[in-house]
Amino acid sequence: MFHATTILAYKGKNKSVIGGDGQVSFGNTVLKGNAVKIRKLNNGKVLAGFAGSTADAFNLFDMFENLLQSSKGDLLKAAIDFSKEWRKDKYLRKLEAMMLVLDRNHIFLLSGTGDVVEPEDGQIAAIGSGGNYALSAARALAKHTDLDEEELVKSSLQIAGEICIYTNTNIKTYVIEDEK
């Protein structure tokens, strides 16, 4: 379980959105409440969020971004190549971390054990200590409301932040809209 992080991604009809809270904890102490755990990649066409050690996040983001560039923006190929590299590298294999990556076509959960998982519904995925709360809220809101994609992510993370002690309600979202 990765404490101090909740990341939620939603691939809707018109937009793909990823959001995260801002809390960083060490044991039972909140160290920071406004951390940003999400990055835009590939000129904003891919969004990525991270759960795990903050120090490792920058290396993993850079590694994934390089693979995304070498695959000419093909998210599926980059995700698979990233997973292979993560499993092969002795240092990276020891990391207990997860990433969510998405574009307008795909959403993937990448784990430190080399898994590349596309959610069954192809629309909603969450990671981190409040991930299950955010995922549950997002599924319910998607099914029973007419919230737009960004509001759905914000509302779901708000709910997670009200339940999970390792998640706060300082929510940051990033959006990819359909090209016009």
Curated annotation (Swiss-Prot):
Keywords: Allosteric enzyme, Cytoplasm, Hydrolase, Metal-binding, Protease, Sodium, Threonine protease. Its EC number is 3.4.25.2. InterPro entries: ATP-dep_Prtase_HsIV_su, Ntn_hydrolases_N, Proteasome_sua/b, Proteasome_suB-type. Protease subunit of a proteasome-like degradation complex believed to be a general protein degrading machinery. Belongs to the peptidase T1B family. HslV subfamily. The gene is hslV. CDD domains: protease_HslV. GO terms for molecular function: metal ion binding; threonine-type endopeptidase activity. The active site is at T5. It catalyses: ATP-dependent cleavage of peptide bonds with broad specificity. A double ring-shaped homohexamer of HslV is capped on each side by a ring-shaped HslU homohexamer. The assembly of the HslU/HslV complex is dependent on binding of ATP. This is ATP-dependent protease subunit HslV. GO terms for cellular component: HslUV protease complex; proteasome core complex.
